[in-house]
Amino acid sequence: MAKTYDYLFKLLLIGDSGVGKTCLLFRFSEDAFNTTFISTIGIDFKIRTVELDGKKIKLQIWDTAGQERFRTITTAYYRGAMGIMKVYDITNEKSFDNIKNWIRNIEEHASSDVERMILGNKCDMNEKRQVSKERGEKLAIDYGIKFLETSAKSSINVEEAFITLARDIMTKLNKKMNENSLQEAVDKLKSPPKKPSQKKKQLSFRCSLL
């Protein structure tokens, strides 16, 4: 059966329990929001195919449990991830403070070239805000990571967050492919051309006695 996509990108949502990872996933994959979601047990995933630069990208998005008891299970999924979103709740100071711990987990378990993004979720609840947008931006700048505030409930910046991460992965992938093609061309130039084999001409002489 022919593939219906050009590339498959594996994305991961990590962060403390209750920050809204599952809600973000459902908003992006199904454009739905449900206030009765229970905490993810272990790990779950959704799929959505998007088009970027004329290519169909299948996004396989994994939603991880934030509870400590599932940490061993969830870190096993870091290795194959091409993009990781670290999510905190703007109404929960502790979830923001723990972003640094989640970043350390990524450094320990994920690929060194994984694309990363920090999301400050629940920005629709501004009246209960404990973490300013400026603090979120500063943290992201300190680690050289992109940052967005999102709201799964109000559908604010959810689409933009996932598409931005996918586009960053695509850009890095294209760069690697171009570098590989360039290296192959350089290697060919370095290799000395093969000389065509020449058959030795055998000359025969006739001796005649006069």
Swiss-Prot record:
Which keywords, in A-to-Z order, does the entry hold? Answer: Cell membrane, GTP-binding, Lipoprotein, Membrane, Methylation, Nucleotide-binding, Prenylation
Q: What is this protein called?
A: Ras-related protein Rab-8
**Residue positions of covalent lipid attachment, annotated as S-geranylgeranyl cysteine:** C207
Source organism (scientific name): Diplobatis ommata
Q: Which residues bind GTP?
A: 15-22, 63-67, 121-124
What's this protein's family per the entry?
Answer: Belongs to the small GTPase superfamily. Rab family.
Q: Could you name the domain of life of the organism this protein comes from?
A: Eukaryota
Q: Which residues carry this modification: Cysteine methyl ester?
A: C207
Would you tell me the Gene Ontology cellular component terms? Answer: plasma membrane
Q: What is its main location?
A: membrane
**InterPro entries in the record, alphabetically?**
P-loop_NTPase (IPR027417), Small_GTP-bd (IPR005225), Small_GTPase (IPR001806), Small_GTPase_Rab (IPR050305)
Instruction: Give the bilayer topology.
Output: Lipid-anchor
Q: Name one GO molecular function term.
A: GTPase activity
Q: Which residues form the propeptide?
A: 208-210
**Cellular compartment(s):** Cell membrane
Q: Where is this motif: Effector region?
A: 37-45
